[in-house]
Amino acid sequence: MFDQLESIVGRYEELGELLSDPEVVSDTKRFMELSREEADLRDKVATYNEYKKVLETISDSEEMLGEGGLDDEMKEMLKEELSSAKSQKEVLEEEIKILLLPKDPNDGKNIILEIRGAAGGDEAALFAGDLLNMYQHFSESQGWKFEIMEANITGIGGYKEVSALISGPSVYSKLKYESGAHRVQRVPVTETQGRVHTSTATVLVMPEVEEFEMTIEQKDLRVDIYHASGAGGQNVNKVATAVRMVHLPTGIKVEMQEERTQQKNRDKAIKLLNTKVFDYYQQIELDKQNAERKSTVGTGDRSERIRTYNFPQNRVTDHRIGLTLQKLDSILSGKMDEVIDALIVYDQTKKLEELNK
């Protein structure tokens, strides 16, 4: 472990020099790759440096206690310092083990969040809107940028489908566990008998794809330009600004009309399409590799029921880790930390167990 850490420190120092090299700075692709690598190593190096300081404290304290000639007060102080340092050493060793776990290369990326109303008609579409608000409020609490990319709104204010770009530090690492089927149990607004209904919305979290990672060839792309429309389908723009893009080999389609100009809609559409197409091919590759890179939290199946939101009991249950919290109102308002932290800890624990086998 220590040889690996020393190697990491050496690479971190090398990266610092490379990132100040004008030749590297002028190469955008290489500069971004090296910057990500440096950011990935930063916590490892800082924790290891702290660990070495603690080892030094332990060594110094033991040496002084072994020399003798100390009064009782000094002995007691050194013993307390030694005990504290040994406890800290154990904590840091566990932190280092977790930091050295193989890291998902997408963890530092922004994400495209896609939510669809599934089983349950209008109620499922309304619940999709509730989930969108939950993720938006959580994003705001993290200091992330939240931007609607594509929305198919129903007549009662829900969403058949909605996509958002969430940008900021470690977005994917925290929200990657949200992919799957989310089930809601509540009395719908349209229910006159007061009966509890069960509906479902699906969530898909895709790491945003950089331009240098995925480029769709023009021959594989169909672009349609049309007039943006508002509620009820009426035309709201005399200039054709809305953009529809279709990736012909896969049939994946995106439509963009949120922006006022055709160019802005085109830019957002290609960003969303790149991510969806990249994700499509990545999923095929993952299936071929027998889900090797899928999270240990759940099966990784995107249709898997991962969580239930029970309104009558104010209860949220994450079925993958057996977590139940009587805090539904709080969680849907964006206070998701307790759920997300539990998923991260569970995932790390499982990976450590696999590593120690």
UniProtKB/Swiss-Prot annotation:
Disulfide partners: none
Subcellular location: Cytoplasm
Entry keyword annotation includes Transferase: no
Database matches in SMART domains: PCRF
Record Pfam families: PCRF, RF-1
Gene Ontology MF terms: translation release factor activity, codon specific
Keywords associated with the record: Cytoplasm, Methylation, Protein biosynthesis
Record-stated family: Belongs to the prokaryotic/mitochondrial release factor family.
Name by which UniProt lists this protein: Peptide chain release factor 1
Organism: Lactococcus lactis subsp. cremoris (strain SK11)
